[in-house]
Structure formats: C-alpha cells, structure tokens
Amino acid sequence: MRKSAMGPNRYKCMDSDTKKKIIRDLIDQSTLAVLSTVTPQNTSESAVVEISVRENFELIFDTLPNFRKYRNLKNNHDVSVVIGFEPATVQYEGVAVELNGEELKEYRRMHFQKFPEAVKFKKLGIRFFKIIPKWVRYTDVSRQPWEVFEVEFPVV
C-alpha cells in the first residue's frame, strides 16, 4: 500500500463488523466482478462474471464447462476478484469450490433470484461455484486520505 495515499490509519480502531458491513454494502450493490484464475501453465486469466454474495461473504458465480475459467478452476482453486471500480472497490482473495447436491440447489436458487435471465443457461450445463473468502481489502479513492482497510477470514 502507498502510505501517502492512505494517510494515518484511522480505520485501525474500526471493528470488524463495521468493516464487513461497508464491504458487504458495496458487494450487494454490484452485479459484475473481474475474476482472475491461474492456468495449468501458471499464467493468469481474468473474466467478467455476475456475482451474488451470501451472508458469510461467500461469492457465487456461474460459468460453462467449455470456458477457460472452468478448466483453470479444475486445476487450481485459488482466485482473486475485483468488485466495483472507481471510486470504491473491493479486492477479494479466496478459494473457488464447484457446487453440487443440496448446496448447489440453495446457491443456484439465490443466484437466479438476482439474475433471473441466467436460468436460460441451465440447458447448456451451467456450473456454479462459491468462493470462500480468505482476505478482502476495501478502498475508496474519493476520500482524502484514501479509505483503505482489510479483513481476513479464517481458513476452513
């Protein structure tokens, strides 16, 4: 982080619940995110995806099995996501897990509530993933100094 952009760390005393609420509000308002995955050759690839978010900060997205991100995720589950753009943004690192069984039904229902037009892709074999958060950073560059804080999540 650039200390000059951040100024004094006034968010050091902000409790975790307040930080999470600010982050959650931004994610809730967003429909699109940039998802970055790693290829089997250890190069990065990024794609725009529609996202939903659960109370526990797990992100939900869908893809088709013939897309590069799907193949990448079968090989390496580590991902990063950028949500929101200027002036406020969330950087999110986590682990992507393909959904199945009862969990798939629950997450798919929630995602289709936010994106009803995505139902048409069911017949094409749409796949759903959840991303379990490890680390999240919030940045708002419209504030002076910039508002920047991080939240870490327990690794399960």
Over which residues does each language-model region extend?
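Charged, gly/pro-rich active-site loop segments
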Residues: R2-D15, T89-V156
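Short beta-strand segments
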Residues: S30-P65, R71-L73, V79-I83, Q91-E93
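Short, solvent-exposed cationic patches
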Residues: C13, N66-H77, A118-F121
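Generic structural signal for secondary-structure transition and capping sites
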Residues: T31-L32, D78, P116, V136
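Alpha-helix boundary recognition
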Residues: I27-D28, K74-N75, F112
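A short local loop/turn or secondary-structure capping micro-motif enriched for an aromatic residue
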Residues: V53-E55, R68-R71, L99-G101, W146-V148
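Hydrophobic alpha-helical segments typical of transmembrane helices
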Residues: K19-I22, K69, Y107
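Short, basic/aromatic recognition patches
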Residues: C13-L32
